[in-house]
Amino acid sequence: IGYEKVFSMLKNGGAFARFANHPYRDKENVELSQEIDKIYDLDYNKYYNKERETISGYTEQQAKEIAMIASKYGFSDIRYELFYRERVFSANEYIELLGTYSNHIAIEESIRTEFFAKIKEAINNHGGIIKIHDTIDLQLARKG
């Protein structure tokens, strides 16, 4: 529906730009990542009755495939660009970030509180910081 709405709103020659952020958790600190994965299994995945998802970095091939979706809705001159950044969080800052994610907010409060406390403890036990490697995907397309 989104592509159709954007296409109908644009004049001929109008441009559509879409940004998406794809965070990848601390690939240098494997032990911390493994501990956080276990915490997710015990709390988050159990709450949502999900299996652990394999976490990997966002690739150029994925960016290309997603950008090309616009062609199905009549867009042309389709391009994409990837940008990279690293964010460093203290344990408290990272918990504050997680607290902004709708799928984390939706967890029943007592479970969420314990879940966040475990993640905070894991980060503090592994140096007190966590790095997030973002791949920012810019997709551009034109009507007409």
Segments predicted by a language model, with ranges:
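Conserved Class I S-adenosyl-L-methionine
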Residues: G57-G144
